[in-house]
Amino acid sequence: MSTIITHRQFPHYHKYTMDLAGRPLTLEVGKLAELANAAVMVTYGETSVLCCVTAAPRPRDGIDFFPLSVDFEEKLYAVGRIPGSFNRREGRPGEKGILTSRVIDRPIRPLFPHDFRNDVSVMCTVMSVDHDCSPEICGLIGTSAALAISDIPWNGPVGALKVGLVDGKLVFNPTSEQRKVSDLDVTVVSTGKKVVMIEAGANQVPNDVMFEAIRMAHEENQKQIALIGQMVAEIGKPKFDYPHADFDQELFQKIVDATMDQAKAAMDTDDKNVREARWNQLIEKWHELFLEDYPEMDKYLEEITYKFQKKIVKAWLLEGHRVDGRQKNEIRPLAAEVGVLPRVHGSGLFTRGQTQVLSVATLDTLSANQKLDTIWEETEKRYMHHYNFPGYSVGEAKPARSPGRREIGHGALAERALLPVIPPVEEFPYAIRVVSEVVSSNGSTSQGSICGSTLALMDAGVPISAPVAGISCGLIQDDDGSFTTFIDIQGVEDFHGEMDFKVAGTKKGITAIQMDLKNDGLTMEIIKNALDITYDARCQILDQIMLPCIAEPRPEVSKYAPKMITLHIDPDKIREVIGKGGSVIQKIVAESGAKIDIDDDGTIHIASPDAESCAIAKKCIDDIVFVPEVGQLYYGRVVRLMTFGAFVELAPGKDGLVHISKLADKRIEKVEDACKVGDMMWVKVTEIDEKGRVNLSHKDAMKEIRAKEAAGEIIK
């Protein structure tokens, strides 16, 4: 019986192309993943990312949030590699994959209807990687296109672009080589009118340059938005209707009318615990007043609380009043301390209001660098920052868990903020890890981690080029478009505000930005205002608190940190230092107790808890790679006597011959008349013949030494 093969056609296949920063961008629909609500294959240069969006047909019961999940899958076949895991499969998402998922999540989430409760899944699978074309940008564009043409309710589309700063010029979607020398890496996502996401790392870039990069990217994004708009017009599906989240507006209004004064009194405090206690008492009052008439009121309590608090906070902020009595540009009380923990390499405690972060710095050898097995170009990290957020920091009783996406994201933000000021490995050959423990949280813990990290690094003696501080800016907008920005947002302002605009940097410029929104985007006026007030605030933090605490990095690393010596040898000598099967280097490590790392270029890093062990290891290596130089003086031991001269050891296993005629100023009959085995003597290298044999002269050495001593030189 023969098999009949039918050639499959793709009747719904569509292809859209445009030029993006000098490279072709292609969006293909209707060929892959036809059963998803929508799927778009994005190809930019030779980078290909499949973006699929699906939605549950019915809302999830019993929730008061939008259940959106975004996954960015890194497939190592995309870069022609097999995973290094035991089963040779990709495992859980790596840090970069999680961070990219968050970058995609942040701009699309605010554009869904606020009362939409259907599960929505966004999955971006990286299938091919051209390092000149960012998979992150492909994921953002593909997700925007897929959601826009799907039947899922969404108020997009958005466009996305990266901007670099190369030789003082702004560059769209910089290539791999340009990124290596770029002073800026900012991702900007925008709708047709506003900017909805900014994520930046920068080498102390001034505000005006950062603003111009954002403005130019927003304008360039309109080309992508126009292309996706064309797709929607030609192949877009009608958006499906959904049941709107249930809410009792009548009950809400009665509660507001009856208890507005008590609610304002409950909110008006700078103590988070007091505010929550007062609010719990207020909820009890609601039960007394309304439970009999509204027996199902408990299922609305969370949303009633949210809407009521937001109503108060918004009205106050628009009037220039904050819940803790501060002015809109006023920072909470600050405190800074270093040397908090006795035996760690460096520690810093940073306090801002009821937010408190303890950061601890640890130094180790370069073998402790984090190895990365990803699709990205970076293969290892020398500077690492980890952020921990235990339940007790917000007064919750919950068990410890492994870091979630939020912890990883906040840790990466603080890491990115400090990276531009970390000294190069040539100047400071240590692996560096900072752990920030959030011990109390009332907003802006990520920015507290940045300040704490700076304190810990300086306390550890890491010669950072400039101290870094971080601060967040909030936003409230009125219905007429007027807005108020306010600095150093605390928890309740973050929860009920429309923006968390985090900016970190030095006095010279910005090192990191992360922007979270709960509205439909920011105008250029708001962005410029946020950049300006965060600059003033971080300078205030540096001048008034951090620098008075520790003005500059300690001159030396902690006595508990490993001592480090760096050598540079001829790469051809590496084999001799390592030895057959590692025998030589293992012997050096055993004898000295030091750790030794050898780079392919001949750079050797020696580390040990004490300087003596480093010195022993260094001498062993110096002896192995020692090459005598003609004309140089050496102080060596006589190891063998022959009738024609004496052999003097210049370094272990390396000796030279002092002919009998070169042993003394006068003629001697026997070598034994001038020296014996074990004697130490000065010798001068007079010749190294073509076979590598070294000829020495004690007579010439002493003549040169006497001349130097007569001239007042000290011979060592």
Q: Model-flagged regions — what are they?
A:
Residues 151-267, 457-555:
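Mobile "lid/hinge" segments at catalytic clefts and subdomain interfaces of large enzymes
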Residues 3-14, 20-23, 37, 48, ...:
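Alpha/propeptide regions of enzymes that mature by internal proteolysis
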Residues 2-56, 241-377, 562-576, 584, ...:
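Extended amphipathic alpha-helical scaffolds
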Residues 114-120, 155-157, 224-242, 273-274, ...:
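Flexible, glycine/charged-enriched surface loops at secondary-structure junctions
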Residues 38-41, 133-151, 338-361, 442-462, ...:
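Conserved phosphate/anionic-ligand binding catalytic regions in large, soluble enzymes, centered on
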Residues 24, 36-121, 126-128, 133, ...:
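Glycine-rich, flexible beta-strand/loop modules in the N-terminal catalytic cores of phosphate-handling
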Residues 560-564, 571-716:
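Single-stranded RNA-binding regions, centering on S1/OB-family and related RNA-binding modules
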Residues 106-114, 149, 340, 365-368, ...:
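Conserved helix-loop functional segments at active or binding sites
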